[in-house]
Amino acid sequence: GFMIRPSTIISTVGEVMTPALLVLLLVVGITVFVSPLSDIVAPSQAYAENSALTTGLISGYQTMDVLAAIAFGGIVARALSAKNVTNPQKIVKYTISAGFVSVILLGCLYFALFYLGATSDAVAQGATNGGQIFSRYVNSLFGTAGTWIMAGIITLASLTTLVGVTSACGDYFSKFSTRFSYPFWIVFFTAMTTIISQYGLTKLLRVTIPALLLIYPMAIMLVVLQLVRNKLPFIRLSYYTTIFVTVCFSLIDSLKNLDMLPEGLHQIMTHFPLYLQGLAWLVPALCTLVLSMIFGKTISK
């Protein structure tokens, strides 16, 4: 119900759910560093076959942090407005502050998760996803109490994500139709989320990973473009060309993941840097951005 009233999002998520989640994660994180289950061992499976760094980066798509950052900025601004913070400068200030705190907290969280994964050899055998490893690790550390800690972490993490994503989607889609209001979209997306969640994490990842391989590079380049926006001599040219090239090459990465890429194109792409690591889009996208800046200066003159 509080998702339907944006003014209650900050008080519910910011003052109750997120602090409780952070406390549980802090307990787990400290315990992992104090009493790791295993020594750090060499990477295995995909992390051993390819570069551990690039494999980790692509796996990081599943966090959807960049997509969330793009969407949640509007939610923060909307929630602040509902709290009678209407001064644009203050909204920008508070949004930047919230983003800075998020970066610090996420950095600490991921560092703890990195160490957890690196020392999980004792419980990682047979696991099909990171969620299973995390659950086994916590249960091994805390015993019976670990079950309750995991239940709390999963519940709070799911609820905070649900609130943020659903509110962002509701806010976005309500702008395109007066017939379907913000509350309608909140109810609709909540119902869809409930149905889709029944398929389980492993099955969902099989569907979402190819989609993220297509979408996530665009989100990354949009953030990069926004960061250098003031340096772009011809903004429209840089945006259109960079995103177009990113889409083309990220589509190739997505089709490769699905084993649907034509063999001829695959042979050609093996000559491109980072293609075999699943990052075929990176170099072409950055090169296109640089070239668009050079041509933009020429056109401006």
Predicted regions mapped to residue ranges:
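Membrane-interface loop-to-helix entry segments
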Residues: M3-V32, I209-I220, Y239-T246
